Design a protein with these regions (language model features):
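Aromatic-lined substrate-binding rim segments of carbohydrate-active enzymes
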Residues: 61-127, 208-213
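N-terminal carbohydrate-binding accessory modules
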Residues: 23-75, 105
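Aromatic- and acidic-residue-enriched segments that line the glycan-binding/catalytic groove
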Residues: 90-96, 120-144, 190-200, 236-243
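Conserved, mostly hydrophobic/aromatic
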Residues: 41, 68, 76, 107, ...
Length: 310
């Protein structure tokens, strides 16, 4: 075994030795307090991997989730794809590979906590960022802004989502520990400077309010590039940074937008990268990922591998 393989094996062992409690089939508590994540009253880092339920045949969900647990992770994160479920106005589908609730239940049975990322915009290299195509046919519709027609539809979506998975929150004995409000909204704010910042912030706050009004009562969070928190963060939600490798910068910017304290999390830590036509294959080294993982672990930084599978 060469030195790099030894280092990766060591990191996997270290991940598995971090105390995460006996999660499987056990009711747990989760809270953000004193700058840390607490599981069952103990400071616990979130060691997460992203895996999207519709990108894996449902017959393989349990096997893949079990593999995630075996590699030392304690959490799985997933987007929720609005256009996957509401294929036509008012026509909902949560069967088969779309059975989000079953996916979450299996994750809990396999000892994993769950981070839910419902958008309503999700990016994820998914058609229309997860928005249903038919939104474009509604008169007066302006997506992703403080628009009555749009917010009416996002409310229906979020309420329907709560019907499916609300009882699976950790507050009700389930595995869902956190829910993301919007998604990388700071990037959109940076691109849409024609819209006043205050309007962007109103919209962002209203999505957060819709989640709370529907019944989601676990901690909410946002995820953005660390230089985009001004537009992407929203009061009452933990700001997390995507792709941030500089721990000092991560802690500085989170402190600025979160009352001077953590916890600190990289909600998208990239062990791979997407490929575009006619571009060179992304060159990401195993050794670099191993070193960065070690840095996070040594500095009380939680993370979510984007992606682990799927």
């Amino acid at each position: 075994m060469d030195s790099m393989k030894k280092k990766i094996a060591y990191l996997l062992l270290l991940l598995m030795l971090i105390p995460v409690g006996s999660f499987a089939k056990e009711k747990r508590t989760f809270e953000i307090k004193d700058g840390h994540f607490y599981v069952n009253g103990k400071v616990t880092p979130i060691l997460s991997g992203e895996m999207h339920y519709p990108r894996i045949p449902h017959q393989y969900w349990r096997h893949r989730l079990r593999m995630m647990r075996a590699m030392g992770l304690n959490t799985v994160a997933t987007y929720v794809f609005w256009n996957l479920h509401e294929t036509e106005p008012g026509k909902w589908d949560f069967e088969g590979d779309k059975n989000l609730a079953e996916y979450i239940r299996i994750a809990g049975e396999e000892g994993l906590m769950v981070i839910l990322r419902p958008g309503p915009y999700v990016c994820a290299e998914w058609e229309f960022g997860g928005y249903p195509w038919w939104l474009q046919n509604i008169p007066g519709m302006e997506i992703r802004r403080d628009n009555p027609e749009f917010l009416k539809r996002t409310k229906l979506y979020i309420d329907k989502l709560y019907e499916q998975v609300g009882d699976l929150q950790v507050s009700k004995g389930g595995p869902i520990i956190m829910v993301q409000a919007e998604n990388e909204f700071g990037s959109y704010v940076a691109q849409r400077k024609d819209i006043p910042l205050e309007e962007h912030r109103r919209y962002n706050a209203k999505i957060k309010r819709q989640l709370a009004d529907a019944g989601f009562n676990v901690p909410l969070f946002t995820s953005d590039g660390s230089w985009l928190f001004e537009g992407g963060s929203t009061p009452g939600a933990l700001p997390t940074a995507n792709g941030e490798s500089n721990v000092e910068n991560l802690k500085k910017v989170v402190n600025e937008y979160h009352g001077g304290v953590g916890p600190y999390m990289v909600a998208e830590f990239y062990p791979g990268w997407l490929m575009h036509w006619a571009e060179p294959f992304p060159d990401i080294s195993d050794s670099g990922i191993a070193r960065q993982t070690e840095t996070y672990l040594q500095n009380d930084v939680s993370f979510n591998f984007y992606m682990v599978h799927g």
